[in-house]
């Protein structure tokens, strides 16, 4: 027999849905039978399949262990690396500095050692996450970053935080800032690039157009050049729209591709500066700027967080021209 106390993440769901998640190997036919014969009870009493569970309810299941989730020792996330760069953490969210080379979610090449796998392991070992107890929610990422790009990723610890942050992302109340190194220098020190983008799903590439064409979506990329050295420009970028490969494709369209970008840039140009196999792009800063109610996350309003280390700052200023780690990142001048 196993007992479960209904927590915040399981509140208001149907009894049968909860049982499916608590005992995923229990056949549907037995589920109905066990509820009917009182082998599954809510607060010590027989309940209907459609019963909506409330916070604090106790669900008792007098069923064999074979119907429950696999044992702790076989959880895949326990095989993930323990290494996490945590920028900020509280009871609702985590902000992680994802390093280049780490996947956010599993793919065909890497199933276990991913950012979400590491987060699950970390919270499990802290006692904040248990697959047996939190049956309707697991730690979830609010945003994702490509494997070859590093930077800040937001993780939600509970369903309410995930709901709020997903809405805030949609409403553009989370501002994400990137650092990148461009080959060349934009015509203006700062500005907003406005164009249109079409994604080729099969090739996983995008194309940029000056004017709207069928199936295209508007893109807006705000930028400011911080410094230019030896034909390379360290640039801060804010995405005003969030499209696939937007930063990489947009700057390449204007003749200033990202250093190291083999997909939208020029390998010949890249080789002039070294044998880099990844683009110089990092999501280094995040600002919460709520214009509507943020519920349990209201305390985050107007707060800004930065990643501690951007790997290519030192590369950009290589040779001791500028001490990049202590340099104040502000533009010399601004043009409109």
Description of each model-found segment:
Residues 124, 187-188, 202, 228-231, ...:
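Short, conserved beta-turn/loop elements at beta-strand boundaries and strand-helix junctions
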Residues 223:
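Long C-terminal interaction/binding lobes of large macromolecular proteins
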Residues 48-52, 236, 278:
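Short, surface-exposed secondary-structure edge patches
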Residues 204-214:
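Short aromatic-glycine motifs in intrinsically disordered, low-complexity regions
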Residues 1-201, 306, 311-317, 328-332, ...:
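RNA pseudouridine synthases
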Residues 147-149, 173-177, 192, 216-220, ...:
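Short gly/pro-enriched beta-turn/loop segments at secondary-structure junctions
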